[in-house]
Amino acid sequence: MSLWPNRSRNWRVHCDCRGFNLDRHVSEINERILEGDAAVFTADEIKDMVRDGDVPSADEVDVVTTATCGVMSGTAAVMHLRVSEPGSFRKAASVELNGIPAYPGPCPNENLGSVDLFIYGTGHSREDPDYGGGFLFRDLLLGSEVEVRVTSVEGRVVESTVTMDDIETARIVGTRMAFRNYTALVNPGETPVKSIFNAFEMPENCGGLSFSGCGDINPLENDPSMETVHQGTGVLLNGARAIVLGEGTRSSPIKPNLMLSGDLHDMKPRYIGGFRTAAGPEIFNTVAVPVPVTSERVLENLMVLNSDIKLPVADVRDRSRVITEITYEDVWSGDVRPVHHPERCTDCAVCLAARRCPTHAIDNGLDLDRCFGCGVCAWSCPSGAYEMDTGTVRIGELAVPIICRQSDRLRARELSLELKKLIENGDFLMG
């Protein structure tokens, strides 16, 4: 059965979950937004209220902004860009951007000197194995020049450089985004394992745990049956207004995710970028989704806390093999960002923290704008120049350290706050 029933703007929910019958149209909430009277909270604010025992009623909350940030492999861009003068080549047979293969078409743009193309966020540069599509998209947003190489069907090579301003069309399409949280992984084997699920080889004998998921602020954790999130819902994708196209690939009632699209031109480099792993570069994105409170049931779903959310721990060699189960409280109780102590640096011949940093945040210091809060630097530096408590979890008799976070609650919180402000200003309506 589809998770996306037909819903209109005036879709109505009748619910009397706690003795209070809320019957509210989304259009009524939009009226309050336009009048400047809407009560809008971030998911973080709601969770703090729940922990403090100050649980709001449904008539006291109009919208809650939820968000997640993490590695999202199902990311691609659709682009149209001019390469050379019309007539210089018939059509493209292959295209590369900064050495990353792109896929020309489907429109041939015959003799126009331009190309339509798809390029994957997980694409790897032929010239630099640490550079991929996520880094490329961020570089474009920063205004950097990008090298374009087209090989035509006639065998002619055409090279040029472009910036974001030169690319007429650039849309991100997320085929699988904002999973309802995810999985933690360990390696119970006797040899290290290369995987996209860790920034470096997963240590043997359950020597470390990596995980994904922003826990109780995750959009679909707060609307697990998708009562308010549906095809056509407006969201923020990496800071840009975007839209839910429908279910993402591999979406299921238990593990739903979203297919999204937004204009790359409008995105912010803070929220999208590359993430190096032991198996090559990946891409991270940030998604914020509004949840209009149309019923008591919707509000009750928003009361979920990290301690309520199960996090399966699986074998990285076979992710279908679940070893145990913990909660998101177990993995999100530590520090959000590392602290740099330069006086502790012993000038190692090879700085493991810099070599392993997934976002290139370490270069003669710590760039907190690039930092993802993954914790890899603290785990890797033998002299303690980078300090961060990411916590440990129990797996049987073992105390297993958390060595890599592939999600970032700080960026997620920032984008949920941006969305809250847009709604409060009357600039973002529910759909």
From Swiss-Prot:
InterPro entries: 4Fe4S_Fe-S-bd, 4Fe4S_Fe_S_CS, HcyBio, Methan_mark_16. The keyword Disulfide bond does not apply. Residues 336-367, 362-391 form the 4Fe-4S ferredoxin-type domain. Signal peptide: none annotated. GO terms for molecular function: 4 iron, 4 sulfur cluster binding; metal ion binding; oxidoreductase activity. SUPFAM superfamilies: 4Fe-4S ferredoxins. The keyword Phosphoprotein does not apply. It holds the Pfam family Fer4. Keywords: 4Fe-4S, Iron, Iron-sulfur, Metal-binding, Repeat. This is Uncharacterized protein MTH_1684. It comes from Methanothermobacter thermautotrophicus (strain ATCC 29096 / DSM 1053 / JCM 10044 / NBRC 100330 / Delta H).
